Amino acid sequence: VSEPPATAVPDLVTLHVWRIPRAAVPRALARMATLPPRLRRLPGVRFAKLLGTGTGTGFGPGDADLTRWAALVVWDTAAAADRFDDSPVGRSWARIARSSVRVDLRPVTSRGEWSGRRPFGDPPGGRVAGPVLALTRARLRPRRAATFWRAIPPVAAALHGAPGLLARFGVGEAPLGWQGTVSVWRDPADLVAFAYRHPEHRAAITRTPTEGWYAEELFARFEVRDVVGDRTVLGWVAEGDQVTGKEHA
């Protein structure tokens, strides 16, 4: 089967997040070492990453949350995505998970690359009525890492109290060099207000090209189509109760 063109926008992207007991951390680390190739080979998977997460309080090297793990998967079809829970990878995480959640996403905008690819294609944009998820991901240049980490605390502190923020946490493929953030917002206006009007975040945006922090970067925005499972795994705030989503105990 030929690979879709780089500009092809997937119909469905899913974010799976698992909360595990601390006693299961060694088993989670083993899965992170062995499961990525199996995840990429699942039928219907166009692009996939297994990710560690952070608490979202600082987005720095000391922010790791070893009791929460995630997978971001780009699918060819919704039917293929529906088979994930019964796949060897899905069952493997379910065996050690205390709780879990799946977020169904539609790409709205995306720029940049991840591992040399454009996994979300070239979305045309458009209006979104309802919650949006913002994903930022970068591979830091080692010589610039210290400067980057010093710039993060003011942004993290500002994000914590941002109006309309429903959930936020860090994600990463490795402890230091491959960093990202996930944030969920009540609507696009709240995201735009924080991203472009908050002084700390604007300062970081301005410094990015001049500091040369990133060897590779990607910024994407998604419509949140559904939240299935225990949204507290995402750190969802009480305001999230206003969002329509399927909840399963």
Q: Language-model segments: which ranges?
A:
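Short S/T/G/P-rich N-terminal loop/turn motif that feeds into the first structured element of a domain
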Residues: 1-68, 78-84, 96-180, 190-197, ...
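Extracellular/lumenal glycan-associated surfaces
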Residues: 74-77, 186
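A common structural junction motif
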Residues: 89-97, 201-203
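Active-site/pore-lining binding-face segments in mid-to-C-terminal subdomains
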Residues: 186-205, 209
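An exposed tryptophan-centered "aromatic clamp" motif
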Residues: 213-214
